[in-house]
From Swiss-Prot:
The keyword Transport applies. Keywords: Cytoplasmic vesicle, Golgi apparatus, Membrane, Protein transport, Repeat, Transport. This is AP-1 complex subunit gamma-2. InterPro entries: Adaptor_Complx_Large_Subunit (IPR050840), AP1_complex_gsu (IPR017107), ARM-like (IPR011989), ARM-type_fold (IPR016024), Clathrin/coatomer_adapt-like_N (IPR002553), Clathrin_a/b/g-adaptin_app_Ig (IPR008152), Clathrin_app_Ig-like_sf (IPR013041), GAE_dom (IPR008153). GO terms for biological process: intracellular protein transport; vesicle-mediated transport. Coiled coil: none annotated. It comes from Arabidopsis thaliana. Its main location: Golgi.
Length: 862
């Protein structure tokens, strides 16, 4: 006998498949069995049809194709006997889905079986319909399902309700047919029918507002009574789960009450008492009770306001936070985050418990609790919360320190009551987790320090102390050497001592030692060492007695394999040795940096193709030169190399001061002496400028430390090129006249318009540079509200360069307007049009508003 004939039993086939030792053997067994089944199908063997289909279902579950057996399902369904129909419907649900065209052929059989006199066959048809019903089948069979909702047998009514749910999901328009039958099911005593009826009514309410109003008026009181009866019912072994009567029905009723009470005060008042009873009397020592309590809390927080109930609900969530089950604590944290918008004061009372969750061993709970704490922080509690988080930072796991550090820095920066507290907390974070502090954070710290002149001495002394215990934190080292370079005299002289400070004695040599250690430390990278060299140059001016030692330390890097450090060492040594008359001017103390400008730039997160600069476009980090010495002879470097033009740099200090080192293009020509000198001085003091073209000279710009991989192209000289450098040097040297020849031949456009804001663009062209377009953006407020913290951001494709000037104001008056100028250079003029993505952010009455759009309607020819 063929072991794989149609007469083979299902168990024998399963045994043969499981006996296969390799995948190839299994495929061979399945292939032979499928061949035998195909032969049986072709012979129309009715005796073994049900057995063949059972085998196909098992083969299908193993992942092998069984499409050739789909018609066998229909043949078995059409059979008169119950056993054949059972296998047929089971195969239909398993081998087919609602997307199969074969389903069109089974609709008539389903309709006949739904009207069958045998209730078990009716049940089979309902099961199949509930699993694979398509939209077409739903429209054809909805009347039969509606009729069966009133069938005498509760099992049929239950299955019909589940089918009705599927029908409503597929064809929402049919929901009105089930409103009255669904309402009738809510009065059922049989729990199985009742739970499906509640589920059906919930689905109807979600898709039909008319049905929602109907159930609110007709069924709310009945549902409340049903829930009260179940909550107060005595022990029933049939429905009891962990001492609670039918928790599944509890949860379904609470979900429906939540839908009915949301947005309706009368319905909410009707259910307040029962919700309070469920919330206060349900035991929380078992999982079933916790599930009911969680659903009850969700319902309380969703219905119309009742202060006492909400406090009760949030207290339940607070108890959840003390539960040993991580899942319960996690869902409690999630729910508390959603509750913040409803009753933040009640959530604040559980702050200590939430803070303990931050210290939990479970990573998911840690992160969720940290997010919740971050939302709870305000001006009143920032000090104790920041203190707790910073203390935990010392002992937290390495994997969690990054997120924790970022949140602490954001909290401290956002809610700091005073600058000295902000500086103290940031120094603690830098000391404990400096390696996790992002660049924009410590850049912002430097901006705050420059804006607190009365704290300069205190800050530099605090940093000096911190370095002795946390020298491995590179970010701390960078901030410290920057401050020592700027305020070394205050460190040594103990200037600006505060009452809370302990006296400290620091000599000039001690200050030099700290910076020298930063250069020689094995963890210091190129950026840190470059900053340390600049700090040493400044110290040599602050402390003339240490000049020789500083010169010696700087000279040790003349042979560095890092060209960046090598050239800085050579040039700084030359400044100390040959140009003492201008050294003090070169290394003057940094001017106060504009906090508002930096915050706006930082919030914008503009892409690299966008440059935003101030009205005075050039500022040099770590000192502004003001001397009138001959620039060509400054360092005896007469190189002809010029820096490559750049549209923007991500370097902080260049970005912060709005440095715009781009050169206007012009016809090639000989470099003027003032231009060469300007480039040298620019190269000397810059930190983030791009590397220049090397034309055989070793004296090019080797001072760039962040953009050395930028594309390099020769810069062309222009009569207007030195203008920004002349601004830097207070106007020394000739100031070439600026061309005013601009044409306004392009029409204005409405770049963006919403119900609250309108943006107009006006265009002018520079006749000497047709690729460049000057745009004046006019922002018009269409509302009677004042827009504060107004910020316009834009991004363009790579073939465009965009330069943004600051807006005329960061506040847009009611029904008023402000202007902002920008310059767009199209390197593909004539080939590609200008396009731009824009984003506008502002606040209305303290609420953040963000509008975005794409501008494609620029005039042709730009």
């Amino acid at each position: 006998m063929n072991p794989f004939s149609s007469g083979t039993r299902l168990s024998d086939m399963i045994r043969a498949i499981r006996a296969s030792k390799t995948a190839a053997e299994e495929r061979a067994v399945v292939r032979k069995e499928c061949a035998a089944i195909r032969a049986s199908i072709n012979e129309n063997d009715q005796d073994y049809r049900h057995r063949d289909l059972a085998k196909l279902m098992f083969i299908h579950m193993l992942g092998y194709p069984t499409h050739f057996g789909q018609m066998e399902c229909l043949k078995l369904i059409a059979s008169p006997g119950f056993p054949e129909k059972r296998i047929g419907y089971l195969g239909l649900m398993l081998l087919l889905d609602e997307r199969q065209e074969v389903l069109m052929l089974v609709t008539n059989s389903l309709k006949q079986d739904l009207n069958h006199t045998n209730q078990y066959i009716v049940g089979l048809a309902l099961c199949a319909l509930g699993n694979i019903c398509s939209a077409e089948m739903a429209r054809d069979l909805a009347p039969e399902v509606e009729r069966l909702l009133q069938f005498r047998d509760p099992n049929i009514r239950k299955k019909a309700a589940l089918c009705a749910i599927r029908i409503i999901r597929k064809v929402p328009d049919l929901s009105e047919n089930f409103i009255n039958p669904g309402a009738a099911l809510l009065k059922e005593k049989h729990h199985g029918v009742l739970i499906t009826g509640v589920h059906l009514c919930t689905e109807i309410c979600k898709v039909s507002s008319e049905a929602l109003e109907y159930f609110r008026k007709k069924c709310t009181e009945g549902l409340v009574k049903t829930l009260r009866d179940i909550a107060n019912s005595p022990y029933s072994p049939e429905y009891d789960v962990a001492g609670i009567t039918d928790p599944f029905l509890h949860i379904r009723l609470l979900k429906l009450l939540r839908v009915l009470g949301q947005g309706d005060a009368d319905a909410s008042d009707c259910m307040n008492d029962i919700l309070a009873q469920v919330a206060s009397k349900t035991e929380s020592n078992k999982n079933a009770g916790n599930a009911i309590l969680y659903e009850c809390v969700q319902t309380i927080m969703s219905i119309e306001e009742n202060g006492g109930l909400r406090v009760l609900a949030i207290n339940i969530l607070g108890k959840f936070l003390s539960n040993r089950d991580n899942n319960i604590r996690y869902v409690a944290l999630n729910m508390l985050m959603r509750s913040l918008t409803v009753d933040s004061q009640a959530v604040q009372r559980h702050r200590a418990t939430i803070l303990e969750c931050v210290k939990d061993s479970d990573a998911s709970i840690q992160k969720r609790a940290l997010e919740l704490i971050y939302l709870l922080v305000n001006e009143n509690n920032v000090k104790p919360l920041a203190k707790e988080l910073i203390e935990y930072l010392e002992v937290s796991e390495q994997d969690f320190k990054g997120d924790l550090t970022a949140k602490i820095c954001s909290i401290v920066e956002k809610f700091a009551p005073e600058k000295i507290w902000y500086i103290d907390q940031m120094l603690k974070v830098l000391s404990e987790a400096g390696t996790y502090v992002k660049e924009d954070v410590w850049h912002a710290l430097i901006v705050v320090i420059t804006n607190a002149p009365d704290l300069h001495g205190y800050t530099v002394r605090a940093l000096y102390r911190a370095l002795h215990t946390s020298f491995e934190q590179e970010t701390l080292v960078r901030v410290a050497i920057w401050c020592i370079g700027e305020y070394a005299d205050l460190l040594v002289n103990n200037a600006g001592m505060l009452d809370l400070e302990d006296p400290i004695t620091v000599t000039e040599s001690d200050a030099v030692d700290v910076v020298e250690n930063a250069i020689k430390h094995h963890l210091s990278d190129v950026t840190t060492k470059a900053m340390a060299l600049i700090a040493l140059l400044k110290i040599s001016s602050r402390f003339p007695s240490c000049s020789e030692r500083v010169k010696s330390i700087i000279g040790q890097n003349k042979g560095s394999f890092v060209l960046e450090l090598q050239q800085r060492s050579l040039e700084f040594s030359s400044v100390i040795q040959k140009h003492q008359n201008i050294r003090s001017s070169l290394v003057e103390r940094m001017p106060v940096l504009d906090e508002a400008t930096f915050s706006g730039r930082r919030a914008g997160s503009l892409p690299a193709s966008v440059s935003t600069s101030g009205k005075s476009p050039l500022g040099i980090p770590n000192g502004v030169a003001k001397a009138a010495a001959p620039l060509v002879d400054l360092l005896d470097l007469g190189s002809d190399d010029t820096p490559a033009p750049t549209s923007s740099s991500n370097n902080f200090l260049q970005d912060l001061l709005g440095v715009d080192l781009s050169q206007p293009s012009a016809q090639p020509g000989a470099m003027q002496p003032s231009q060469a000198g300007a480039d040298i001085l620019m190269d000397l003091l810059s930190i983030g400028t791009p590397a220049p073209v090397q034309n055989g000279s070793a004296n090019g710009d080797l001072l760039s430390i962040q953009d050395n991989n930028a594309p390099i192209a020769p810069s062309l000289t222009s009569p207007t090129a030195p203008s920004s450098m002349m601004d830097l040097l207070d106007g020394f040297g000739p100031t070439p006249p600026k061309s005013e020849d601009k044409s306004a031949a392009y029409p204005s456009i409405v770049a963006f318009e919403s119900s609250s804001l309108k943006i107009e663009f006006n265009f002018t062209k520079q006749s000497e540079n047709p690729q460049t377009t000057d745009i004046v953006a006019n922002f018009i407020n269409l509302t009677p509200n004042v827009y504060t913290e107004f910020l316009f951001q834009a991004a363009v494709p790579k073939f465009l360069q965009l330069h943004l000037d600051p807006a005329s104001s960061n506040s847009l008056p009611a029904n008023g307007n402000i202007k902002q100028t920008m310059r767009v250079t199209n390197s593909q003029k004539g080939k590609k049009p200008i396009v731009m993505r824009m984003r506008v952010g502002y606040k209305i009455n303290g609420k953040d508003v963000l509008e975005e759009g794409q501008i494609n309607n620029f005039p042709r020819g730009l």
